[in-house]
Each structure stands twice: as structure tokens, then as C-alpha cells.
Amino acid sequence: MDPGDGTAPLDESFTETVDFCGRTYQKYALTNGVFFAPIDEDEIARLELMHSVLSRVFDDRLIFPPVGSPRRILDCGCGAGDWAVDAAGRFPDCEVLGIDASPHMVPEDPPSNLEVQIDDLNGRFTFPSDHFDVVHSQMMAGGIHANRWRSYVRDIFRVLNPGGWCQMVEIYFNAQSDNGTLQRGELSYDLLKPP
């Protein structure tokens, strides 16, 4: 990846941490309302588990449509990098770029075709237009400010190649069943319904 193809550079404040209730947090993320999850080993384990669960739910499909041989993939909010590492492994001839606000959870030994940049996705993308074949954004609802969502989605579509694929994955905590077996009034439904 060309170092100029990225987002705005950040200062050293991204490395500062704060401890609270026995957990470590990124000070920048808390101060700027980027995300409120810890950045410690327990959080990395939680992210790995979430990746495993989503992989199983999605029948081990990283990208939903058949995309052939993508040349460039962008993973927005890559966290501990599990999805990006898998994408780099499945598409070894592809450049995979992961972006995350925290430098504390970057994969220790990433594949050679994976680069991770530290940046706040609440700022505008500086990538060139029509640059990526796939843009993946997963579990970003808590990390993108409400007033940024429209421009965030516009940025994603601007940097996608014509015919490229935008894949956004969020969890909607509303218990449902496609065959009607889960009904209102059942304990499992009531426990899982949103407040």
C-alpha cells in the first residue's frame, strides 16, 4: 500500500491508556467518544470469539457474494484483526488494509499482504476514489458518531471500485425466528428483546 493512500495521520495521543476497574482503555477513544470497550487481552479474546461465532453463523463466508480475486480490501474498524487476517489468508494476492483507532490490539504477526493503519474512522477518508474491490465494516455502530454515518457510508462507496462490494455487519439484538417458533411471551424471546 502507498503510505499516502490512507486516512489523516494521528498524533501520539492514540497510544495513551487509562486503567478503570481493572481493565485498560484507550484514552483517545474515551475522550473522543470513539468506542468504550477495553483494549486488553480479555477484549482481544472477546473479539476472537465474536469472529468465530460470526464465521459459523455465516457458514465461513468472509465476503457474501463471489468476488473472484479482489486486488484491494479495506476492513474498517478491524479491532484485533481476525477478519482482516482471514481475508489476507484467503486472498494471498490481494492487498488487505485494516483501519482501527487502537494501536493496542494490532495483530502481532500479520500476513505479508495485510497492513494495519491506526486512524479514527470518524474523520473523512483520504483514500483515492475507486480504490478498493471490497470494503468491510463490522460492529462499527458504537464507533461511528451519529452525525458521521451518512458521510461514512458515502466515503465507503466513493472508495469502492465500480462493481465493488460494501459489506456492513451489525448485530440487531431483537430475537426473531424465520419459521415463527419463537413467539412473544416465551422466556427466550422476553430475555432477548430490546429494552
Name each region found by the language model.
Residues 150-165:
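A short glycine-rich, Lys/Arg-flanked "PGG" loop and its adjoining helix->strand segment in the class I
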Residues 191-195:
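Extended, non-catalytic structural segments that build the interaction scaffolds
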Residues 1-130, 134, 148, 170-182, ...:
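N-terminal charged/capping segments associated with class I S-adenosyl-L-methionine
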Residues 142-146:
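A short His-aromatic
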Residues 137-140:
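A short beta-strand submotif of the Rossmann-like class I SAM-dependent methyltransferase core
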